[in-house]
Curated annotation (Swiss-Prot):
Record flagged with keyword DNA repair: yes
Organism: Mus musculus (Mouse)
Family named by the database record: Belongs to the uracil-DNA glycosylase (UDG) superfamily. UNG family.
Site feature: Essential for recruitment to nuclear foci: 81
Lineage of the organism: Eukaryota, Metazoa, Chordata, Craniata, Vertebrata
Chain residues that bind dsDNA: 150, 171, 249, 270, 272, 278
Enzyme Commission (EC) number: 3.2.2.27
Coiled coil regions, renumbered to chain: none
Name of the protein in its database record: Uracil-DNA glycosylase
Amino acid sequence: MIGQKTLYSFFSPTPTGKRTTRSPEPVPGSGVAAEIGGDAVASPAKKARVEQNEQGSPLSAEQLVRIQRNKAAALLRLAARNVPAGFGESWKQQLCGEFGKPYFVKLMGFVAEERNHHKVYPPPEQVFTWTQMCDIRDVKVVILGQDPYHGPNQAHGLCFSVQRPVPPPPSLENIFKELSTDIDGFVHPGHGDLSGWARQGVLLLNAVLTVRAHQANSHKERGWEQFTDAVVSWLNQNLSGLVFLLWGSYAQKKGSVIDRKRHHVLQTAHPSPLSVHRGFLGCRHFSKANELLQKSGKKPINWKEL
């Protein structure tokens, strides 16, 4: 649409060709600055206002409010144009303020460039699967991961989860092993798709949401961590009685901001084969989470529903 920049226009190369210059003379009575070689020359009307302010006539409170309002509206318009594909509506309403921020615009440009030159997981329509499973206000349990799986057909926007018919990776196998001793009647589902939990209000959130194929942590420190911190912060501040399951030092560090008077936090070792015997097996986090949810008046999770 003419007059509206798209997200990717911020990252397009500067076109080459004839260089045009504008007349140094402002349009009479327009109050619009003319540009000469990139430098703005203020109109007489604008100069008068600037000089007046410099002489000790500050902007009125009403003018300051109007300026702030206009800036906020501009950010919202930019954010609305930058909504990523597949972002759930209720999540968008609460998190859209992030979309117009410079770090997020830069992040989206980086991911787009990566997709142009490399295989990136998960595919664009699945990066935000975690926002499509339930309303943001229906979240009950939060499990924090780190980085998406980087093999073919594995990652689909839910941490620890893999698409069918891909077999469960070792960490997920250990999660199922703990469930089989913690939850009565739990039987290995024969697949690794955890969408059944997500639909019940279990947020399965990685700190970083994309990865280059076969290169673990290749998209770390590009902006995803700041965005997912904003997600955790919103949940922490706006909901109550959530159960956060923090497995391993990385998740525990990311969850250090959680208000433990407002929410419940369960911590143990990561389910990776390297650390599973340091406390994950036998932690009983799944039954404990349900007990805490019931104390908060919430419906427990059916961990067998996969």
